[in-house]
Amino acid sequence: MNMAADSVEGVELAWLLAGLVAAPRITVRDLTQDSRSVRPGDAFVALAGVSSHGLDYLEDALARGASAVLWDPTEGRALPPLPPAVTSVSVPGLKAELGDVADRFYGEPSTDAALAGITGTNGKTTCAWLLAQCYGVRGAYLGTLGQGRPPELTAGTYTTPDCIALQRVLRRLVDAGARRIALEVSSHALDQQRVAGVRLPLTALTNLTRDHLDYHGTMAAYGAAKERLFHCRGVEHAVINVGDGFGRELATRLPAGVALTRVEAHPATAPPAGGARGAARFVTATRVIPHAAGLEIEGVTQHGTCQLRSPLVGQFNAENLLLVLGLLLAGGVPLPEALASLTSATAPPGRLERFVCGRAGPTLVVDYAHTPDALAKSLAALRLHTPGRLWCVFGCGGDRDPGKRPLMAAVAEAGADALVLTDDNPRTEDPERIVAMITAGLTGHVEAHVERDRARAIEFAARRAHAGDVVLIAGKGHEDYQIYGHERRPASDRALAAALAEAAP
């Protein structure tokens, strides 16, 4: 999928902002909120952010050739004097209107493709990745791993880009041939209105567990942010994991006119094969069977019974697979075709990705689990595939919710046989302090080691583990960097695990 070229050659501001303000009839080449991406002829959009204001970067934008500045006079910041050749347009309430402005600028790309927006604490990436694969050659993925048609992706910066960048990427995907797009939607994106202006006929919730409380403050605020997805423009279907407590509540208060598909992947608690509590649309597991090659799921939908085999492992991946099945059915894909496409779909990079260290060595598993719930689920999934000891290498991110650190320790101690505590993006915090907060949650009944150098920690666990053992390397997944201070240093758990596996006799 070639996404190299932009299809927008320039738009007149008077037309773009019609109905908002009277703007001059000048043409701008592109829109951007990031001063670093400004090119000559662009309009720089300067708005208040979480920790700074776009006007703080105005000088940089002008130096790079911005020909116009759009700003909101109601945000309490005055616009500095501009060079005579630069046009300024003040737009009251610009932040609330920017999604629609960007949508118009890029030719309303979400009218040219059917989008599925997926939110939730855990599982967004896997679900979107699986869904994009099921969509085939006309499908695309946009999220944490980048954007494009799996497995060939262009790197991205955020799970969900800002509203201008998002519309730009959608236009590129559509122009490259995408007609169905699976989109990860983060709680930050929903809170910051990054998906405003995007039409999302299909929506889904995976689950809601503790994460991002450094940003949202409370679980109630976190849940409220997630719920905004189902009030976005053009929502027609909501596919919700009702095995999750928040999901069950959300399913009772969807907006009028939104068709609900209930997904239940836990046979012990699932309703009988007539559907989830009488729902007209449902995907319900009646049996989940783990085996050496993955999962076998037996279930029932409003279209009849189903049987699904997948190379993915773990009960949580049964939830992910059934959620994607629900999205496919809601999007009009026939059940046999949906099952066939899911059977051949593979897990994304860094999501329970296995590296076998020869016949005499352990299996290394790289995973993105970085919340207590995700870590517990990954350990539980791997326990079913571990004849020997289960090791866990993990840490906790700096400048993020410190309250989850002892919880991560408790979960790791409960689920693993041996632990290695290490660094995981300490950022501007003291790494020793982070490790100390993690160890405070340990009781001491499981073997535990501390090795702050992450590469050495992984190598230590790989050397100490034996054939039949599994080493879960948790927290970073696909990431290829380690953040110390404000510096990103090259570091890849996947690359190291692959090298250790290749070097094993």
Regions found by a protein language model. Name each.
Residues 1-27, 37-43, 53-56, 259, ...:
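ATP-dependent carboxylate-amine ligase
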Residues 2-119, 126-137, 223, 307, ...:
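Short, basic phosphate-binding NTP loop
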Residues 58-63, 174, 196, 231, ...:
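Non-catalytic positions within long, well-ordered alpha-helices that form the structural scaffold/packing
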Residues 67, 201, 417:
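Receiver (REC) domain switch/active-site residues of two-component response regulators
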Residues 73-76, 144-145, 187, 208, ...:
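Short, ordered loop/turn segments at secondary-structure junctions
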Residues 76-78, 147-149, 189-191, 245-249, ...:
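Short, active-site-adjacent cap segments at secondary-structure transitions
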Residues 77-83, 176, 191, 200-364, ...:
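Acidic, Mg2+-coordinating active-site environments of NTP-dependent enzymes
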Residues 97-242, 246-258, 386:
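Phosphate-binding loop of NTP-binding sites
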